[in-house]
């Protein structure tokens, strides 16, 4: 079956996490992603956080599935010639270099457009135009500057970054959407264009409910936040609110049976108004259904600490899965806190391809995240990540059409090998 992006060729100059997240998603949908890497070195994540000596790390393998790898010294004259030919043959160039790197490489936007007017150049940067645009950004920096950290954590504690990589992977997903949108527009315009996703912008987009709450503050306290019920005044910025629900329905993380020894024996519980009476029955407080102090959502807001303490008395008598089963029967919103171990072993996630097993020639079998987006007419399969330069000759021949003699000349030029160090005199 033909995949959604079959026929689209991506020139992938990305590294670490944000860019590879984008290009891996495109590869899962069928694009031919050619990962350009430095000879002898490759993507820096090949050697980062290695759990097995002398093999590609999981950091690399889990972000570079379904790609082909070519090594190329873009400072070498012959390497520049090869890159020029690749630009002619590809639809999209994706990069997450620091500002100005493509220009210094000798391939600014204007030159790329001369070489291939239909090429889309997609970039991830830390910040958009402004006072910070030249600053280096990593995952946690993006979370801190995009509004996530200042609104995550508990009111009396430090700002916190999340375990989810919303800065890197989140921005990569934003860029992928930008690329397919530009590809669609090209079917009408016949022209390429630049696509940019800034990490600060991506994090803010994912934290939009907090920007919503910032504006609500001008009209009064945020009543669904715990501190309202505790009588603590609000300041001029959205506060950290612990595990309060962000959707207007009060919610908390509560202890379950076994919490003393199991760090993940917890459940998230939402006191949604339409099921309040069912909640009262489940926890053994039927009088709360008619008591004016508890019957209506507005009356409950100042008493949330008391209410959740009572609910927790009930959840502590059940495992998180027992509690979930009971609550789901009454459509009471909840969710167990699942550890990564539990997720890795979840057979339903295996069945849907969200968690997959991959066999790698040097590190053996490992599990990874598959495509989280399912298309009924474009199934995704997860193929192992490439070894460094594994497809160099294949790409030179099958994509660029070089003859054996031309390929040999390129090898002799040093364009595909690490630069030779000058011997000391």
Curated annotation (Swiss-Prot):
Q: So what EC number does this one have?
A: 2.8.3.16
> Which GO MF terms are attached to this record?
CoA-transferase activity; formyl-CoA transferase activity
- What superkingdom heads the lineage? Bacteria
Reactions catalysed, as given in the entry: formyl-CoA + oxalate = oxalyl-CoA + formate
Which UniProt key words apply to this protein? Transferase
Q: Does the keyword Lipoprotein apply?
A: no
Question: Where do transmembrane segments lie in this chain?
Answer: none
Give binding positions for substrate: 247-249
Pathway named in the protein's UniProt entry: Metabolic intermediate degradation; oxalate degradation; CO(2) and formate from oxalate: step 1/2
Q: Where does CoA bind?
A: 17-18, 38, 72-75, 96-98, 104, 136-139
Which residues are responsible for catalysis?
Answer: 168
Stated role: Involved in the catabolism of oxalate and in the adapatation to low pH via the induction of the oxalate-dependent acid tolerance response (ATR). Catalyzes the transfer of the CoA moiety from formyl-CoA to oxalate.
What the entry lists under NCBIfam families is as follows:
oxalate_frc, PRK05398.1
Family label: Belongs to the CoA-transferase III family. Frc subfamily.
Q: Which HAMAP family match?
A: Formyl_CoA_transfer (MF_00742)
Q: What is this protein called?
A: Formyl-CoA:oxalate CoA-transferase
Q: Which organism is it from?
A: Bradyrhizobium diazoefficiens (strain JCM 10833 / BCRC 13528 / IAM 13628 / NBRC 14792 / USDA 110)
**Recorded name of the encoding gene:** frc
């Amino acid at each position: 079956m033909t995949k959604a992006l079959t026929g689209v060729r991506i020139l992938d100059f990305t590294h670490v996490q944000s860019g590879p997240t984008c290009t891996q998603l495109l590869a899962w949908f069928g694009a031919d992603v050619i990962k350009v890497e430095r000879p002898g070195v490759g993507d820096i994540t090949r050697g980062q956080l290695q759990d097995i000596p002398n093999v590609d790390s999981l950091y690399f393998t889990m972000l570079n599935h379904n790609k082909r790898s070519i090594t190329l010294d873009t400072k070498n004259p012959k390497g520049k010639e090869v890159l020029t030919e690749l630009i002619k043959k590809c639809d999209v160039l994706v990069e997450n270099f620091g500002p100005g790197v493509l220009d210094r490489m000798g391939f600014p936007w204007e030159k790329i457009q001369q070489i291939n007017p239909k090429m889309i150049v997609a970039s991830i940067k830390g910040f958009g135009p402004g006072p910070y645009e030249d600053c280096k950004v990593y995952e946690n920096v993006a979370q801190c500057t995009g509004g996530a950290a200042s609104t995550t954590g508990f009111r009396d504690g430090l700002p916190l970054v999340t375990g989810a990589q919303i800065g890197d992977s989140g921005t990569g997903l934003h860029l992928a959407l930008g690329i397919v949108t530009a590809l669609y527009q090209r079917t009408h315009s016949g022209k390429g264009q630049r696509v940019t996703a800034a990490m600060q912008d991506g994090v803010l987009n994912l934290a939009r409910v907090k920007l919503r709450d910032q504006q609500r503050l001008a009209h009064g306290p945020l009543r669904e936040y715990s501190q309202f019920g505790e009588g603590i005044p609000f300041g001029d910025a959205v506060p950290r609110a612990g595990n309060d629900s962000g959707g207007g329905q009060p919610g908390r993380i509560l202890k379950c049976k076994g919490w003393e020894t199991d760090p993940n024996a917890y459940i998230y519980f939402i006191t949604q108004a339409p099921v309040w009476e069912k909640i009262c029955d489940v926890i053994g407080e039927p009088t709360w259904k008619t008591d004016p102090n508890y019957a209506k959502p507005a009356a409950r807001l100042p008493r949330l600490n008391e209410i959740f303490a009572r609910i927790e008395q009930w959840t502590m008598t059940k495992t998180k899965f027992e509690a979930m089963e009971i609550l789901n029967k009454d459509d009471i919103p909840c969710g167990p806190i699942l550890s990564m171990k539990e997720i890795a072993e979840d057979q339903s996630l295996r069945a849907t391809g969200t968690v997959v097993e991959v066999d790698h020639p040097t590190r053996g079998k490992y599990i990874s995240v598959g495509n989280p987006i399912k298309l009924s007419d474009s199934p995704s399969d997860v193929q192992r990540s490439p070894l460094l330069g594994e497809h160099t000759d294949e790409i030179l021949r099958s994509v660029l059409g070089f003859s054996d003699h031309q390929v040999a000349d390129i090898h002799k030029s040093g364009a595909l090998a690490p630069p030779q160090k000058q011997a000391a005199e």
